[in-house]
């Protein structure tokens, strides 16, 4: 066999041209200083804002400050192994976390690494944690209810899917309890929940996870935990990581609920990082962009339209809207809602639920102040039967609060005022609710109907909750079809109303409570 030299050279040329080898060009820099998880790096000329940086021993950081001759970065995780003179490489990637249904039922840290001891999570996709919120055209108005199962909220401060509703109050007023009850209430409703714990004690987070497991809620819940022992950077980024995990479901035409517990501690962590990066402090020593810190996070909670979902899924999901509902929690100091961070978040959200220490200590739990709690968009999403029945309860409460103040000084009251005070006392008593016992729609409808129509006016205040419980037990036993109709149609027809009235009257005559 004779080889032609020209053929050999042509063959070699074609083989060399076919090699698609490209040089992996990555900038390398040197650590100049390390302080409290913040490092300054010299020599990184083409790094991006928010880019992941690779340190020795498989430690990663995020570039936050891009200055003329150095880069300020936060180290994610343990920074004790990073020292002056270490080589740092750029990765060309923005910080991202694993997303997908595989995360349900698991407890992960800010980076999506499991910390519950149940082994690795086999997720198929990752997504960046900092994303632009959906535009105005991509959104749909809030029109579907998100039942919390809490009487005071569902009747007077209704929440819709895609809404941002702030839970605000001092420490130890039951803020987390409201959030956990809301998660438990989503069982069987097709809502994926994400609970983001920021700066909480590890024991507190463990208690929440245990309660969710006890009530079968972990199967549709993802817990993102950045405890008080984690670095400030991990606490500051946890909320964005959790939001990305929730957006995965929203963008695929599903409904998700995210709870940030709490954004006060996230703001503290961001303040700490900013001051260590030597950014100029502003009011209360917060950096100038602390409003943007929360607004860009909470704007990502939205209800998106069918076109957005169809485009995002490349036509795989059609005719479905997706939603991400946010319940941020803010802790106030001595009831001061006019502080910097509370006023910021109040202005960003679509309403707020105020929890008061005085009410909590008086035994009114959940300690919701109905007078100053408001839902700006939830009214349009409220269930028909609840909307019809809840109008009177807010009026009764408002008049009761007003009259109760005068009644302290007035010795003799006319009959109308006395009746109003008695009705108000029963409404306050009826809105009390034990923890971990969220109500279904029919239960709330029956409760509201009973108080609105005066069936409780002659029941002793101390017996109101016992009356309510016994009445529901009797309805379950004798009027299961009525309950099912109210639950299915979310309406109270004239026939159903007549049957309910007869059932309550019968219970008052023969029932034991």
From Swiss-Prot:
Gene3D superfamilies reported for this sequence: 2.40.30.20, ATP synthase alpha/beta chain, C-terminal domain, P-loop containing nucleotide triphosphate hydrolases
Keywords carried by this UniProt record: ATP synthesis, ATP-binding, Cell inner membrane, Cell membrane, CF(1), Hydrogen ion transport, Ion transport, Membrane, Nucleotide-binding, Translocase, Transport
Keyword Signal in annotation: no
GO molecular function, one term: ATP binding
Compartments, as annotated in UniProt: Cell inner membrane
Positions that bind ATP: 169-176
Name of the top EC class for this enzyme: translocase
CDD domains, sorted: ATP-synt_F1_alpha_C, ATP-synt_F1_alpha_N, F1-ATPase_alpha_CD
GO cellular component: plasma membrane; proton-transporting ATP synthase complex
Site, Required for activity: residue positions: 373
Record membrane topology: Peripheral membrane protein
Superkingdom of source: Bacteria
EC nos: 7.1.2.2
Catalytic activity: ATP + H2O + 4 H(+)(in) = ADP + phosphate + 5 H(+)(out)
HAMAP family attached to this UniProt entry: ATP_synth_alpha_bact
Family: Belongs to the ATPase alpha/beta chains family.
Quaternary state and interactors: F-type ATPases have 2 components, CF(1) - the catalytic core - and CF(0) - the membrane proton channel. CF(1) has five subunits: alpha(3), beta(3), gamma(1), delta(1), epsilon(1). CF(0) has three main subunits: a(1), b(2) and c(9-12). The alpha and beta chains form an alternating ring which encloses part of the gamma chain. CF(1) is attached to CF(0) by a central stalk formed by the gamma and epsilon chains, while a peripheral stalk is formed by the delta and b chains.
Alphabetized NCBIfam families for the sequence: atpA, PRK13343.1
Its job: Produces ATP from ADP in the presence of a proton gradient across the membrane. The alpha chain is a regulatory subunit.
Name of the protein in question: ATP synthase subunit alpha
Natural source organism: Bordetella petrii (strain ATCC BAA-461 / DSM 12804 / CCUG 43448)
Designated gene of the protein: atpA
């Amino acid at each position: 066999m004779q080889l032609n030299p020209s053929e050999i050279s042509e063959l070699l040329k074609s083989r060399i041209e076919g090699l698609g080898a490209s040089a992996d060009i990555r900038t390398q820099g040197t650590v100049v200083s390390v302080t409290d998880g913040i490092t300054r790096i010299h020599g990184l000329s083409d790094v991006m804002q928010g880019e992941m940086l690779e340190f020795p021993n498989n430690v990663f950081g995020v570039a936050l400050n891009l200055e003329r001759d150095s880069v300020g970065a936060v180290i994610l995780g343990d920074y004790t192994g990073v020292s002056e003179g270490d080589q740092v490489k750029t990765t060309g990637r923005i910080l991202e976390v694993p997303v997908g249904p595989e995360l349900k039922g698991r407890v992960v840290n800010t980076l999506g690494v499991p910390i519950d001891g149940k082994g690795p999570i086999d997720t198929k996709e990752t997504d960046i944690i900092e994303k632009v919120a959906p535009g105005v055209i991509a959104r749909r108005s809030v029109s579907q209810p998100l039942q919390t199962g809490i009487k005071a909220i569902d009747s007077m401060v209704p929440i819709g899917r895609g809404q941002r509703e702030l839970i605000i109050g001092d420490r130890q007023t039951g803020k987390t309890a409201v959030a956990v009850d809301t998660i438990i209430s989503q069982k069987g409703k097709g809502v994926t929940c994400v609970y983001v714990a920021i700066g909480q004690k590890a024991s507190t987070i463990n208690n929440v996870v245990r309660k969710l497991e006890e009530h079968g809620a972990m199967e549709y819940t993802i817990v993102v935990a950045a405890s008080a022992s984690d670095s400030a950077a991990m606490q500051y980024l946890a909320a964005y990581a959790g939001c990305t995990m929730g957006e995965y479901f929203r963008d695929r035409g599903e409904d998700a609920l995210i709870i940030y517990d709490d954004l006060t501690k996230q703001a503290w962590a961001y303040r700490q990082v900013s001051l260590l990066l030597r950014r100029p402090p502003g009011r209360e020593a917060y950096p100038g962009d602390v409003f943007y810190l929360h607004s860009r996070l909470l704007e990502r909670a939205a209800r998106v339209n069918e076109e957005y979902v169809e485009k995002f899924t490349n036509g795989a999901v059609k005719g479905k809207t997706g939603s991400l509902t946010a319940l941020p929690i803010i802790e106030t100091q001595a009831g001061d809602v006019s502080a910097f961070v509370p006023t910021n978040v109040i202005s960003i959200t679509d309403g707020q639920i105020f929890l008061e220490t005085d009410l909590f200590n008086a035994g009114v739990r959940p300690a919701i102040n109905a007078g100053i709690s408001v839902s700006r968009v939830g009214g349009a999403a409220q269930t028909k039967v609840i909307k019809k029945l809840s109008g009177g309860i807010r009026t009764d409460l408002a008049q009761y609060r007003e009259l109760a103040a005068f009644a302290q000084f007035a010795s003799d009251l006319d009959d109308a005022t006395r009746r109003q005070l008695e009705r108000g006392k029963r409404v306050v008593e009826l809105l009390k609710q034990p923890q971990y016992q969220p109500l279904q729609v029919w239960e709330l409808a029956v409760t509201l109907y009973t108080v609105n129509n005066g069936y409780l006016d002659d029941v002793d205040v101390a017996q109101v909750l016992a009356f309510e419980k016994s009445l529901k037990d009797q309805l379950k036993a004798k009027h299961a079809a009525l309950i099912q109709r109210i639950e299915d149609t979310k309406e109270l027809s004239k026939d159903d109303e007549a049957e309910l009235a007869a059932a309550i009257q019968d219970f008052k005559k023969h029932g034991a409570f």
